[in-house]
């Protein structure tokens, strides 16, 4: 399976506009390790570690669109929260869209 660049996200954090602020240490680390310079409108794939019912790793993933939060002077990802899925549950179309195929 081809793997896209995955950026860590703590899906429990969101700002007043229901966006994911890109401030977690894991997020900052992944952005730096992949030499990603954030910009408005950029699309990235975010993940959070998860497991299936047998204890096997099966991360949660979702696409986010980068926006600059002018009030807090930081970047945030606009995520469709209902689209968060375990990798094993992605349809073929979703796998292609997120870069897994």
Give a label for each model feature.
Residues 48-54:
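Short, charged beta-turn/beta-strand-edge "cap" motif at the junction between a beta-strand
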Residues 23-36:
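Short alpha-helix capping/helix-loop boundary micro-motifs
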